[in-house]
Amino acid sequence: FIGGSDDSLNLVAFLEDQKKEEIPLSEIFAKIGLDKQNWDFRQTVEYLEFTHSDGVEMDFHFAIDVVTDLAAILLECSVSGSVNLQDLDEYNTPARRIRITVTPEEHDAMNKALADFAQNPLEYDLSEMMDNEEIQEMARDVEALRKELYEAAGRNRDYHVKAEDVKSLLPDWRGANGCIATNRIT
């Protein structure tokens, strides 16, 4: 279900059309209209759309569909550092790597939004387009995605760590100027 809808393909087209490697989540939300949802994706309240640089208007039917796809991309960025857009749509998208950047507050809100869908899938407008078994399966997939993204190895990831908080752990570090072998555990 994640990555398999018209909304998914339109999201890939949107990301490809941005023509940059690093895209802030807040910018994606603003350009598509997801920011008007105020992190509540149960009902798609506004018409979500963007106009492609070639002039074609592309719309999104279900806010939660786009959000779960973005979460899957965030997970890939977390694991690999970036995602190749061609891997998301091999037929229509050229090979190009992108990374979505997210603030700690956005991570917290995303975690809550995914958890809400996983716990209450029938409260979402998307459930009107799927039978009960399909929406429950998607809810299980979203919960697995959420856990992988935010509870890896059974620990909550802390996205609030600042560079200053880590400096005391490496008092002899002077800067990166090459690759060295070390016995230091990081």
Task: Name what the model sees in each region.
Residues 51-66:
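Structural motif
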Residues 10, 24, 37-43, 66, ...:
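Structural recognition of alpha-solenoid helical scaffolds
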Residues 27-51, 115-122, 162-167, 172-173:
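Non-catalytic all-alpha helical scaffold/repeat segments
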Residues 7-14, 67, 71-74, 146:
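Amphipathic alpha-helical elements of HEAT/ARM-like alpha-solenoid repeat scaffolds that form extended
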Residues 26-29, 33, 42-45, 71, ...:
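Hydrophobic core segments within long, regular secondary-structure runs in both alpha-
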Residues 1-41:
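N-terminal leader/targeting peptides and immediately adjacent processing regions
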Residues 62-127:
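Amphipathic protein-protein interaction modules
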Residues 110-177:
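Low-complexity intrinsically disordered segments
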